[in-house]
């Protein structure tokens, strides 16, 4: 090989080597370095352990079990064949249940945030600091609706976290969790923000932050940090079919948690605005049925009697498009916005009613402590009426109307093959509206059913066990 050609090969090799080094350096720069963040934030993250005393139902050796409640023949068998030992009085022994979780210090004088489910019903709460010292904690208050709890330990000059703004958090942003999964203190995991504003079943007042950060039992109550080292959420839940982490974790936005903690510190409880409605999502078929251009808003499925919405003129079948200028994209947006108001504050609603836009001003009330439940009543023997939907219906009795807070409607007595069976209607279901029209009686129901359009989504309001929702169906040609 000639010398010029050898030089050419060597230069090409050197160029490739340099390019590889540059690409490696760029890749290293693209990946975040969490070390400084962890060193600065870890001291303010704590382990939380609880103890709870529970009645011990175990039977001591040689002791006669409590046979009360057994059928006579079994009780006689055990009394004949087991040694006659004195029975243990109920509740005279106790066992101790323990649980583990995480938390973080938000003030140098000892206020600690964690999850409600970490400390619920605890008789004793121990906070272990990063230096492994332990402090007894006092429960300042809890808010089960957001799963936030505020604790207080005696201390001075304690390390604290920096609080961020969860509203500024962006999907795709790097985040990091520090906690005690399975009791392993100060374990660090990282990931990205997968989505914002998630709503989970039974958690309508929290717009959760979804991440792919590995969260396991013991992480609950621990902080979720952004890359600035600021807490942007409280790790709260995971979605799993295996019992372990599956890539879906949910954190309570720190803005929500701080608002709750401030109220707990000041009043010992949390106050929220309340409209007094049951709402549901507007899907494509419902949007077509109610004359909307696209699926959006919150459909009012039920208006509670004497509630703020009823007094303010909101009606069943209204679609709420915005509140105080903020659009309702998903139905879950409404509880978040209403919950942020105080008793007596105004909610300016933009709605669609019968295809027309209009505005309502409603003074919100205070969210009751207990959920409102409406009984289903007992079925009466009113005259039946059949129709083209494949259902046999009857008028509601006066008792049913009172129980369900309805002025009219019909109860399904029988479901035959047809559209009703296909959409899952059952005997006992109550229908109050059909094709956006209120139903007064079985006769009216049949008359409206005769005029239903074909090959177009038609809405029907159904109450099952006191719970109302709109469903849609289509009649074929």
UniProtKB/Swiss-Prot annotation:
Positions with a binding annotation for substrate: 218-220, 275-279
Catalyzed reactions: Acts on substrates that are at least partially unfolded. The cleavage site P1 residue is normally between a pair of hydrophobic residues, such as Val-|-Val
Enzyme active site: 117, 147, 220
Any Gene Ontology CC annotation: periplasmic space
E.C. no: 3.4.21.107
Domain of life assignment: Bacteria
Major localisation: periplasm
Biological processes, Gene Ontology terms: proteolysis
Pfam families registered for this protein in UniProt: PDZ_2, Trypsin_2
Family: Belongs to the peptidase S1C family.
Protein name: Probable periplasmic serine endoprotease DegP-like
Species of origin: Pseudomonas putida (strain ATCC 700007 / DSM 6899 / JCM 31910 / BCRC 17059 / LMG 24140 / F1)
């Amino acid at each position: 090989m000639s010398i010029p050609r050898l030089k050419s090969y060597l230069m090409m090799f050197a160029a490739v080597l340099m390019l590889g080094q540059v690409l490696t350096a760029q890749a290293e720069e693209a990946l975040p370095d969490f070390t400084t963040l962890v060193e600065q934030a870890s001291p303010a993250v704590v382990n939380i352990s609880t103890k709870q005393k529970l009645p011990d139902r175990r039977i001591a050796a040689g002791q006669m079990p409590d046979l009360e409640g057994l059928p006579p023949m079994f009780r006689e068998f055990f009394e004949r064949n087991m040694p006659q030992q004195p029975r243990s009085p109920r509740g005279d022994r106790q066992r101790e249940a323990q649980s583990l979780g995480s938390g973080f210090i938000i003030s140098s004088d000892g206020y600690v945030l964690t999850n409600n489910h970490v400390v619920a019903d605890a008789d004793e709460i121990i906070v272990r600091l990063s230096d492994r010292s332990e402090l007894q904690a006092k429960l300042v208050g809890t808010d089960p609706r957001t799963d936030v709890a505020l604790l207080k330990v005696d201390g001075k000059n304690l390390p604290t976290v920096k609080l961020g703004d969860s509203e500024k958090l962006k999907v795709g942003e790097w985040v990091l969790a520090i906690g005690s999964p399975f009791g392993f203190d100060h374990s660090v995991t990282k990931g990205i923000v997968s989505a914002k504003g998630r709503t989970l079943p039974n958690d309508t007042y929290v717009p959760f932050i979804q991440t792919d950060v590995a969260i396991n039992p013991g992480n609950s109550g621990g902080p979720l940090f952004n890359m600035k080292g600021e807490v942007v959420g409280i790790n709260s839940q995971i979605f799993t079919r295996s019992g372990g982490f599956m890539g879906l974790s949910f954190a309570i936005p720190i803005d929500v948690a701080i608002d709750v903690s401030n109220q707990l510190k000041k009043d010992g409880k949390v106050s929220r605005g309340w409209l007094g409605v049951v709402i549901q999502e507007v899907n494509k078929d419902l949007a077509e049925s109610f004359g909307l251009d696209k699926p959006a808003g919150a459909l009012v499925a039920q208006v509670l009697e004497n509630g703020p919405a009823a007094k303010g003129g909101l009606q069943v079948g209204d679609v709420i498009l915005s509140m105080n200028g903020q659009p309702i994209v998903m139905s879950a947006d409404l509880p978040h916005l209403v919950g942020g108001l105080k008793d007596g504050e105004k909610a300016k609603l933009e709605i669609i009613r019968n295809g027309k836009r209009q505005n309502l001003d409603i003074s919100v009330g205070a969210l009751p402590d207990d959920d409102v439940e409406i009984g289903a009543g007992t079925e009466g023997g009113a005259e039946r009426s059949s129709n083209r939907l494949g259902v046999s219906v009857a008028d509601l009795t006066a008792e049913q109307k009172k129980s369900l807070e309805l002025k009219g409607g019909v109860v399904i007595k029988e479901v035959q093959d047809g559209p009703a069976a296909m959409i899952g209607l059952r005997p006992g279901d109550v229908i109050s509206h059909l094709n956006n029209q209120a139903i007064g009686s079985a006769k009216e129901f049949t008359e409206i059913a005769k005029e239903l359009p074909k090959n177009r989504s038609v809405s029907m309001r159904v109450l099952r066990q006191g719970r109302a929702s709109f469903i849609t169906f289509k009649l074929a040609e």
